[in-house]
Amino acid sequence: MQHEAFEKNSLLLLIGILIVVSIGGLVQIAPLFWVDSTIEKVRGMRPYTPLEQAGRDIYVREGCYGCHSQMIRTLRDEVERYGHYSLAAESMYDHPFQWGSKRTGPDLARVGGKYSDLWHAEHLSNPRALVPESVMPGYPWLAETKLDGRDMMAKLMTLKRVGVPYSEDMLKNAEQDLIAQISPDTRKAAELVRRYPKAKVAKFDNKPGQEPSELDALIAYLQMLGTLVDFATFDAAGPNLR
């Protein structure tokens, strides 16, 4: 094969590389748009509640993703430690997704329900009070900072534009649902659970008050992770699954 021209002309070599990489990318990526099980259809998945979404925003803002992944790989040691391997469907409403394998702390894909709200509140305030060997910084200001939910409806509308299936009812009640999720045994809380099945309703930071704190939001988000899919009924079989 005559390749002298490529060796002597860096621009031509660059163009050749781009062409080859483009063809390889198309061959591998394009078929995924026609494969039904690229993202599994999994029962139970729903958009985040307004409080969970606010907590996720705080999770990203504080850089939690730098030390914690949310992707359990199919390796035996990870499945035995953390639980069922992560499904693509579990991240389908994440913008941006929280995948990764670099961990300073444990993976959080299945942390929901593993610890109590009080444990999370104390751990986020002073990690070494519960885990002496922890290198995680504390976030005591979250409990004292009132959650600003004035733009929550606009946030959900933006997410809807990129494919998150928020209904008009969800959008209309966005700010109301922030309060409802920290108000157990109320009519509004019942309406919230109707809109968002399996949503946990509690005063997550264990402090009195009628308005959510940033700590409420972050704990609500953590307590939801990994709880939506019922793996007792999940069938990982399909014509396109490998």
State each model region's role.
Residues E62-G66, M71, T104-D107, V135:
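Short pre-active-site segment immediately N-terminal to redox-active cysteine/selenocysteine motifs
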Residues M1-Y48, P184-A190, R194-R195, Y221-R242:
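Post-cleavage N-terminal segment of exported redox proteins
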Residues G55, R61-Q70, H120, L218, ...:
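The canonical Cys-X-X-Cys-His
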Residues C67, E133-Y139, V229-A237:
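Surface-exposed patches in mature extracellular/periplasmic domains of secreted proteins
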Residues L13-S22, E80-E214, R242:
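Electron-transfer interface patches adjacent to heme c in soluble/periplasmic c-type cytochromes
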Residues M71, G138-P140, Q223:
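A mature extracytoplasmic/lumenal domain signature
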Residues D36-V60, I72-L75, V79, T104, ...:
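Electrostatic cytochrome c docking/interface patches
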